[in-house]
């Protein structure tokens, strides 16, 4: 190993540890949601849909907060964004749920689920980011008037 690579190795290990810890938190939260709100076979997978939509909304809020509002520690984004929210949202379960619907003869529902999930995820991240930007701008205007 080169000297330069050795110098950066502890940072890479720390980054991996932070992402892994966040991923464990997010995955446990998703699993908890599936226990509280189980999906019956052959029905629309509301839990996965809701988790992915909520996770995308949270990603929209997080990105505004850490890019537009304040500078945070460099490990906050990997921990919360890649780790917690990456572990909370789930593309693999999304695909598995769709495949189970197809296998159960519910192809139309599977297609609706696939399309609605993508639309909801993109809409959630966009709407949450826009709402957070509006809220931040409004808060700054109000604070500016008080000063």
Swiss-Prot record:
The keyword Ion transport applies. It catalyses: fluoride(in) = fluoride(out). Na(+) binds at residues 86, 89. It is found in: Cell membrane. Pfam families: CRCB. One of its GO terms (cellular component) is plasma membrane. It comes from the Bacteria. This is Fluoride-specific ion channel FluC 2. It comes from Frankia casuarinae (strain DSM 45818 / CECT 9043 / HFP020203 / CcI3). The lineage of its organism: Bacteria, Bacillati, Actinomycetota, Actinomycetes, Frankiales. The gene is fluC2.
């Amino acid at each position: 190993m080169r000297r330069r690579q050795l110098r950066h190795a502890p940072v890479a290990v720390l980054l991996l540890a932070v992402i892994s810890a966040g991923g464990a938190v997010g995955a446990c939260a998703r699993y908890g949601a599936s226990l509280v709100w189980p999906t019956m076979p052959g029905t629309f997978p509301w839990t996965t849909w809701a988790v992915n939509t909520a996770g995308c909304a949270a990603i929209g809020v997080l990105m505004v907060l850490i890019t537009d509002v304040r500078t945070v520690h460099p490990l906050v984004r990997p921990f919360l964004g890649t780790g917690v929210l990456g572990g909370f949202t789930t593309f693999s379960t999304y695909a598995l749920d769709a495949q189970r619907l197809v296998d159960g003869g519910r192809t139309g529902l599977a297609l609706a689920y696939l399309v609605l999930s993508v639309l909801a995820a993109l809409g959630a991240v966009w709407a949450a980011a826009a709402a957070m930007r509006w809220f931040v701008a409004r808060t700054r205007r109000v604070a500016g008037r008080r000063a």
